[in-house]
Amino acid sequence: MIQFGPEIDRGLFERTLDFAEQQVARLIEKHPGYYPVYTKNGKWKHDGPAWTHWCDGFLPGLMWIFHRRKAESGAQDGFWMEKAIEYTRPLAPRQFDRDVHDLGFIFLSSYYRWYQATRDPKLNEVLIQAGKTLSLRFMEKGQYLRSFVSEDSLFIDIMMNVGIIFYAARETGDRRLRDIAIRHALTTRRYLVRGDGSTAHEGIFDLETGAFLRHSTQQGWRADSCWSRGLTWALYGFGSCYEYTRDPRFLDTAERCADYYLTHTNGDGVPPWDFQAPEDSRKLADTSAAAIAASGLLRLCRMLPDPVKGFYYWSSALHILRTLCEKYTARDDPQWEGILKGGVYHMHKNLGVNESVMWGDYFFCEALENAMRHTLSNQARKGNGGR
């Protein structure tokens, strides 16, 4: 196991999480019962496209992060757990939603955290059903989970959702579910991850034969470019696949995506929205991609057999988090309702551009949480003779 150093700025990270709690408390007071996606001019937007409502788990997920933070500090917490349950429970019907590929986004951020906090077996049943439901999107010809767009479409985003199928397989012992998740990940690896570690957003397949036809994109600059958020979905998602399977092919893929990200991102660790976008457009960063990358790197660094490379990923994640904390939070803008500025939802449709986005806020706080928990666990190991 990699022994992580103590070079974390705990004060900065704690202050940032304090601010995040304030912003979410303000959100639910001002917008009760609302599950936002992105801001417009810093205000959470109540209309506009939500497509599959794929972000609905992230707000309660933030509340569960805050509850766990309180609990691990020894503080009494009634508020955040109460609110987290209030916002998580209405998502239950989505466990049967066969129209979306986003059930991992929805349930791993919400119900899984609720289950971690309480170990109520009824919550685990919801998670298992969500995994089973998502598996029904599997296309035998082509060997992939189809996107919400059409049956011939495979998205890189689905790598963030396949984990809930792995989870259901592990909890039930259903080898068929595990096989579906593995085959989807291998297809994505083969067709959407390029040799240099960059990624395509979408693959199009022949429905008659299952043959791969071409790359496409819904969000990137072009079909042959590398949309930065898609790259970080792959970095994080393939790392999760390796956690479930210990298949070295998935670890290799996660590393290649991580290395591309770290090699091609600016010195502050925050990427352009698309790495191949024209120069004037490439100046626009996407902090949500940076937050996902930081969280993914913190998970990945613990799994590497090479402690030097593991420490490189750990240090890189901390560097990204420092940048986000110091330069991109809305702490100094009292009118701004989100946590993290500078996110991008949909560039081509001009939605949530240079704004707060709910997944960016969630993965930012998840990364801060994980960074501090790793440091605490390392200090505990040192206190027990390093064991």
PLM region descriptions:
Residues 1-387:
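Glycan-recognition and catalytic cores of secretory/periplasmic carbohydrate-active enzymes
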